[in-house]
Amino acid sequence: MLEVLILAFALSMDAFAVSIGLGIKNKQNLKALALKAGLFFGIFQALMPFLGFLGGIGLREYIQGYDKIVAFILLLAIGGKMIYEAFNENVEEEISQITNKILLTLAIATSLDAMAAGYSLHLFNLNIYLSLFVIGFTTFIISYIGVYVGSRGGEKYESKAEILGGVVLILIGLKILLF
């Protein structure tokens, strides 16, 4: 279960960074924004790994014997992408009004990486539903907090959160590959 908690934390770093950005740009009605951001990000961070998990089960017979290498490569790619985006300054756009459509788009965009990471969940031999709940709930809490961090001048934390998330995903990939 420790692996799932670490994975949940790492996957939530994209949503945390975006939530900080939402808080920086929108200082009005923070409680509602934090709740909506947490719900959107939490639901999609739980849904996408489930889709990846189902895909992993479907592909298992074709890649048996290589599944640890595939999981490592996927987590390495996701982690590397997160680290790259942390250093790429032109990724963010100005968002003046946060609508449900914008939150939905951001939730999908930040959770696509989680779909690939979901493939590795079958390697942990844990209850998938509990794992997805932990991922979703962790993302909800971290996103909720991120809005408040951003509203209090959190510009300095955005890229650090993505770097940390990327490094943790790469380390999880190494653990899967080596143990």
Swiss-Prot record:
The keyword Cell membrane applies. GO terms for cellular component: plasma membrane. One of its GO terms (molecular function) is manganese ion transmembrane transporter activity. It is found in: Cell inner membrane. It holds the Pfam family Mntp. The keyword Repeat does not apply. The chain crosses the membrane at residues 4-24, 39-59, 69-89, 102-122, 128-148, 159-179. It is a multi-pass membrane protein. It comes from the Bacteria. Its main location: membrane. Keywords: Cell inner membrane, Cell membrane, Ion transport, Manganese, Membrane, Transmembrane, Transmembrane helix, Transport. Probably functions as a manganese efflux pump. Belongs to the MntP (TC 9.B.29) family. This is Putative manganese efflux pump MntP. The lineage of its organism: Bacteria, Pseudomonadati, Campylobacterota, Epsilonproteobacteria, Campylobacterales. The gene is mntP.
